[in-house]
Each structure stands twice: as structure tokens, then as C-alpha cells.
């Protein structure tokens, strides 16, 4: 077991429920799945909305660059500059809601 990862939130008034420990087998499974998934990123042709926090302490922000570069559809990026990993509970939560609703409305217009 490894120490758990949780509450990577800039807003001190917010907390996230998280496991105290992370089983190593879960991380190995995730790594294996991500390696396989990466082989198919070039098949993504639909519009993408990628949001990431430059100060994320859990997932490197560069991971979104991998997807943005590999995907063949249009990519819209939003930087969540005031938040950490759990951005939906953090300072940028209203921005996330606004951008997701706007994106969904635009891409579903027929």
C-alpha cells in the first residue's frame, strides 16, 4: 500500500473524502490500461474540452498535452489557474460549470 492521495484543493474551506492508502495493484492496473489507451488516442475525432490545473499535485498537467496532441478532433483548452487537482470543489468550480455547459451546447447544436 502507498499513502493515499486526496484533498489536493487550494480552497482551505473545501475537503475531499479520500482513501488513506492506495493499493499498489490498482496503480499497476491503471498504468497498464493507460499504456493501451494511449495507442488509440489518434482515433479521437470528436470535439474535446480539456481542463487542467497547472498546480495539480496529483496528475502532471502535461498529461493533457499528450491527449491534445494525439487527438484529431478540435480541442478547446481551459487552464484552471486558481485550483489544484480536485478542481470541481476548488476555486474554479464556477468556471468549470460555465465552460462545460457552453461547450456542450455548442457541440450538440445540430
Question: Predicted regions span which residues?
Answer:
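Active-site rim beta-loop-alpha module in soluble metabolic enzymes
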Residues: 14-17, 46
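Short beta-strand/loop motif that positions the catalytic acidic residue
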Residues: 43-44, 50-52, 56
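Hydrophobic anchor at the start of a short beta-strand
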Residues: 48, 75
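Helix-rich cap/lid subdomain of alpha/beta-hydrolase
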Residues: 1-14
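Catalytic active-site module of serine/aspartate enzymes centered on a nucleophile-bearing elbow/loop
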Residues: 76, 81-110
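Short alpha-helix in the alpha/beta-hydrolase fold that links the catalytic acid
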Residues: 46, 60-69
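Active-site nucleophile elbow and catalytic-triad environment of alpha/beta-hydrolase enzymes
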Residues: 23-40
Amino acid at each position: 500500500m502507498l499513502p493515499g492521495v486526496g484533498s489536493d484543493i487550494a480552497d482551505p474551506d473545501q475537503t475531499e473524502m479520500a482513501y488513506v492508502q492506495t493499493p499498489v495493484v490498482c496503480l499497476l492496473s491503471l498504468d497498464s490500461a493507460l499504456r493501451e489507451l494511449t495507442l488509440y488516442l489518434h482515433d479521437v475525432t470528436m470535439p474535446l474540452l480539456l481542463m487542467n490545473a497547472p498546480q495539480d499535485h496529483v496528475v502532471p498537467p502535461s498529461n493533457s498535452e499528450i491527449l491534445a496532441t494525439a487527438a484529431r478532433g478540435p480541442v478547446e483548452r481551459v487552464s484552471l489557474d486558481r485550483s489544484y487537482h480536485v478542481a470541481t470543489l476548488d476555486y474554479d468550480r464556477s468556471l468549470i460549470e460555465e465552460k462545460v455547459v457552453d461547450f456542450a451546447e455548442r457541440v450538440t447544436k445540430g
